[in-house]
Amino acid sequence: MGTPAIRAACHGAHLALALLLLLSLSDPWLWATAPGTPPLFNVSLDAAPELRWLPMLQHYDPDFVRAAVAQVIGDRVPQWILEMIGEIVQKVESFLPQPFTSEIRGICDYLNLSLAEGVLVNLAYEASAFCTSIVAQDSQGRIYHGRNLDYPFGNALRKLTADVQFVKNGQIVFTATTFVGYVGLWTGQSPHKFTISGDERDKGWWWENMIAALSLGHSPISWLIRKTLTESEDFEAAVYTLAKTPLIADVYYIVGGTSPQEGVVITRDRGGPADIWPLDPLNGAWFRVETNYDHWEPVPKRDDRRTPAIKALNATGQAHLSLETLFQVLSVFPVYNNYTIYTTVMSAAEPDKYMTMIRNPS
């Protein structure tokens, strides 16, 4: 993350990399604490949008969730924005995208929150998630995808992190990792089709992004990931949707498929793609690493997670790539840091191996 704590921590990266090269691939790598598995819930897409999250919410203390919402909003939202958005939401509720707005209303009714608070906390995440995402191909042509999600408010959000299977007609449509009360997705998998993660591309203040969403009808970043997981039939369709749909903020979308060379980093402007960066394994580019900075630009020394990740992947080697070794790469400091909420590794060709670990658990 681009914070003073992480910037200072990055000075130890060279020592960490030296240790990395001394470790065997079978040994655990530089974990501060043992990670934990988040709870798994089913969300029925056959249920009414207002009701579909309630079975999951019943496993959580409403007071704790409300306190987390208040913390995020209080830290991220100026009071004048809160008052203005409260008025706007009431006027334009019918124009906000479905089923997301109805789902947020159902969550708010259960938690005794206003719709404005629910919309605000969902949009507040849109421009605050620092991350590392990797898509890679092994020597047999198998595609692997991993991500760390770094975010403030870790003490609360680690307790609200969950894996969710979205089910329709008794079948799993897609699997994702999210926070309780949050209807968008930053990490997800459509089985036997594709995987997606989103990384923040820091441009503009987030409340400007929110206003754009409400006034222009553009899609929030995380809502488009969920829409793509719901509707896209294959890797190519997913890439097209993620590249072309107007957004409320800039972002990096990382997509993995099921066939050789099906891996890409999409650098997004609000209006469309700024760059498409695919895997090119025939020319030695068997992985792509994205860490919140345009790949064609040097990363700032204060927040260089890219170089340690690349060195760890090269130390691993294409022939030894697997979900397990990719998890190890994502566990190397400062790729893994004090702000890391969770790590997910996934492969759409092997959907049952989707795995999330909560990091830095208290």
Curated annotation (Swiss-Prot):
Q: Indicate which residues are glycosylated according to the record.
A: N42, N112, N314, N338
EC numbers: 3.5.1.60, 3.5.1.23
Modifications after synthesis and translation: N-glycosylated. Tunicamycin treatment causes a reduction in specific activity against N-palmitoylethanolamine.
Reaction it catalyzes: N-hexadecanoylethanolamine + H2O = ethanolamine + hexadecanoate; an N-(long-chain fatty acyl)ethanolamine + H2O = a long-chain fatty acid + ethanolamine; N-dodecanoylethanolamine + H2O = dodecanoate + ethanolamine; N-tetradecanoylethanolamine + H2O = tetradecanoate + ethanolamine
Lipid metabolism is among the record's keywords: yes
- Locate the active site: C131 (nucleophile)
Q: Span of the secretion signal? A: 1-33
The cellular location(s) given in this protein's UniProt record come to: Lysosome; Membrane
Query: Pfam families per the record?
Result: NAAA-beta
Predominant location: other
Q: How does it sit in the membrane?
A: Peripheral membrane protein
Q: Name one GO molecular function term.
A: DNA-binding transcription factor binding
Instruction: Give a Gene Ontology cellular component term annotated to this protein.
Output: lysosome
pH dependence, entry free text: Optimum pH is 5 with N-palmitoylethanolamine as substrate.
* Protein family according to the UniProt entry: Belongs to the acid ceramidase family.
Functional summary from the UniProt entry: Degrades bioactive fatty acid amides to their corresponding acids, with the following preference: N-palmitoylethanolamine > N-myristoylethanolamine > N-stearoylethanolamine > N-oleoylethanolamine > N-linoleoylethanolamine > N-arachidonoylethanolamine.
Which named protein is this? Answer: N-acylethanolamine-hydrolyzing acid amidase
This protein's species is Rattus norvegicus (Rat)
